[in-house]
C-alpha cells in the first residue's frame, strides 16, 4: 500500500514519513506541501491512501481534488470553521471510499473523549464545565481539533441526557456555557483538560502527550486497519485502529 502525506514537510508529516520508511508493509509515496514539487492532483493519483497532516486552510482544495479522484483518506487535521462545507464534503467523499476523521489519533485522547461523554451524562447543571488545551507555540490552529471535538461530545451528551442545550461563548440564560481556553507556549506536544466544577467539588480529566510519535503510531494503526480489513466506503473514527470497545 502506497501512502501519501499531505503536509509532508511539517512536524507530523516528517515523523510519519520516518515511521513508514521503517515498515515493510507500507511504501512512502510522493507527498504534498506548499513547497513541494508535486501537485496535489499528482500526489492523489500516485498513492493508494492519503494522510492529511496539513492545516485547515488546505482542506477545501484537498476535498475538491479527492472528489475528482477518490482515494481513502485519514483526515488528521483540524477542521475549518463550522461555516465551511467540509462536513458535507467528507460525507460526499465517504460515499466512494473510507474516510477516517481523527484530529487526535492517540489512545489516551480516545479514552478521554469516552470518559467525558460519560461524566457529562452523570453531572447535572450544578456542575460548570471548563476545557483547557495547551500546545506548542508553532501550532497555528486554536482552538484545536481535539478541543472542538470534546465540545461537540459534551453538548451532545447534555442534550441527550439532560435535555439541556450547551454551547461555547453563549450568553443566553437558557443556555449553559462551556468555558474554553487555548494556550500556545513552548514546545508542548499537547494537553487537554476537562473539569466539571460545582460549588462543593471538582473532577478533572487530563490527557498529556509527551511525544508526537504517539500520533504517528496511531495513524499507522489506522493504516493497518485499512490494509487488513478493506473496509467499505463510509465515515469512520480513530477507534477503528485501536481495537477497543469502551
From Swiss-Prot:
Keywords: Amino-acid biosynthesis, Cytoplasm, Diaminopimelate biosynthesis, Lysine biosynthesis, NAD, NADP, Oxidoreductase. The lineage of its organism: Bacteria, Pseudomonadati, Chlamydiota, Chlamydiia, Chlamydiales. Belongs to the DapB family. It comes from Chlamydia caviae (strain ATCC VR-813 / DSM 19441 / 03DC25 / GPIC). Its main location: cytoplasm. It comes from the Bacteria. NADP(+) binds at residue 34. GO terms for cellular component: cytosol. Catalyzes the conversion of 4-hydroxy-tetrahydrodipicolinate (HTPA) to tetrahydrodipicolinate. It is found in: Cytoplasm. It catalyses: (S)-2,3,4,5-tetrahydrodipicolinate + NAD(+) + H2O = (2S,4S)-4-hydroxy-2,3,4,5-tetrahydrodipicolinate + NADH + H(+); (S)-2,3,4,5-tetrahydrodipicolinate + NADP(+) + H2O = (2S,4S)-4-hydroxy-2,3,4,5-tetrahydrodipicolinate + NADPH + H(+). Pathway: Amino-acid biosynthesis; L-lysine biosynthesis via DAP pathway; (S)-tetrahydrodipicolinate from L-aspartate: step 4/4. Its EC number is 1.17.1.8. This is 4-hydroxy-tetrahydrodipicolinate reductase. The active site is at 135 (proton donor/acceptor), 139 (proton donor). GO terms for molecular function: 4-hydroxy-tetrahydrodipicolinate reductase; NAD binding; NADP binding; oxidoreductase activity, acting on CH or CH2 groups, NAD or NADP as acceptor. GO terms for biological process: diaminopimelate biosynthetic process; lysine biosynthetic process via diaminopimelate. NAD(+) binds at residues 7-12, 76-78, 102-105. The keyword NAD applies. (S)-2,3,4,5-tetrahydrodipicolinate binds at residues 136, 145-146.
Amino acid at each position: 500500500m502506497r501512502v501519501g502525506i499531505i503536509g509532508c514537510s511539517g512536524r507530523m508529516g516528517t515523523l510519519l514519513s520516518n515511521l513508514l520508511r521503517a515498515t515493510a508493509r507500507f511504501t512512502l509515496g510522493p507527498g504534498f506541501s506548499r513547497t513541494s514539487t508535486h501537485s496535489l492532483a499528482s500526489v492523489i493519483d500516485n498513492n493508494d491512501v492519503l494522510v492529511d497532516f496539513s492545516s485547515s486552510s488546505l482542506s477545501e482544495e484537498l476535498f475538491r481534488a479527492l472528489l475528482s479522484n477518490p482515494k481513502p483518506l485519514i483526515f488528521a487535521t483540524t477542521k475549518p470553521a463550522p461555516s465551511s462545507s467540509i462536513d458535507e464534503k467528507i460525507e460526499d467523499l465517504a460515499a466512494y471510499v473510507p474516510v477516517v476523521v481523527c484530529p487526535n489519533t492517540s489512545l489516551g485522547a480516545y479514552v478521554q473523549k469516552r470518559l467525558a461523554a460519560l461524566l457529562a451524562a452523570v453531572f447535572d447543571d450544578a456542575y460548570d464545565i471548563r476545557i483547557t488545551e495547551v500546545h506548542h507555540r508553532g501550532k497555528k490552529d486554536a482552538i484545536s481539533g481535539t478541543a472542538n471535538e470534546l465540545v461537540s461530545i459534551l453538548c451532545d451528551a447534555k442534550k441527550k441526557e439532560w435535555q439541556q442545550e450547551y454551547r461555547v461563548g453563549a450568553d443566553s440564560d437558557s443556555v449553559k456555557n462551556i468555558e474554553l481556553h487555548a494556550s500556545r507556549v513552548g514546545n508542548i506536544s499537547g494537553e487537554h483538560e476537562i473539569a466539571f466544577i460545582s460549588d462543593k467539588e471538582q473532577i478533572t480529566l487530563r490527557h498529556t502527550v509527551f511525544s508526537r510519535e504517539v500520533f504517528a503510531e496511531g495513524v499507522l494503526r489506522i493504516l493497518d486497519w485499512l490494509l487488513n480489513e478493506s473496509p467499505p466506503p463510509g465515515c469512520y473514527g480513530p477507534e477503528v485502529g485501536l481495537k477497543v470497545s469502551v
